[in-house]
Design a protein with these regions (language model features):
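Short alpha-helical DNA-recognition segment
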Residues: 60-81
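Residues that mark the N-terminal boundary/hinge immediately upstream of a DNA-recognition element
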Residues: 64, 90-93
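DNA major-groove recognition helix of helix-turn-helix/homeodomain DNA-binding modules
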Residues: 92-108
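N-terminal flexible/basic segments that precede or flank functional cores
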Residues: 1-54
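Short, charged recognition helix plus adjacent turn
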Residues: 19, 108-114
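Residue-level detection of the helix-turn-helix DNA-binding "recognition helix"
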Residues: 84-85, 102
Length: 114
């Protein structure tokens, strides 16, 4: 939050949540990698809306939808729809998206068994 002082009042302005997250992703590469892991975990645990929303923030902060479209061969508008909270990407398209984001963040995913 940012305080703005005028002669008569003090007003608090806030930034939208996604803007705050995007700014932090740009500042902290480790935070971006943690968010990526959170997105994958959310999707695997059945929380697709949460996972897709996180992936969208990562794309907005790190890649851009135009570049993601180039990397995946998918349409930019289609990617926007797929990464919407109500998006429903196919398994193939989701795989292309998470692979491109991982490569852009220099992440090499691995599977561990508990």
């Amino acid at each position: 939050m940012e305080a703005i002082q005028t002669n008569e009042t003090k007003m608090i302005t806030t930034r939208p949540y996604s803007d705050t997250i995007i700014a932090r992703i740009k500042r902290e590469p480790k935070f971006a990698r943690l968010l990526y892991a959170s997105a994958i975990n959310a999707i695997l645990e059945g929380e697709a809306a949460e996972g897709l929303s996180i992936l969208r923030d990562l794309v907005n902060a790190e890649i851009s939808f135009k570049e993601l479209a180039r990397q995946t061969g998918l349409g930019e508008k289609s990617l926007h729809r797929m990464l919407n909270r109500n998006g429903n990407p196919t398994a193939r398209n989701l795989g292309l998206i998470v692979k491109s984001i991982a490569e852009d963040l220099d992440i090499k995913p691995r599977v561990e068994f508990a």
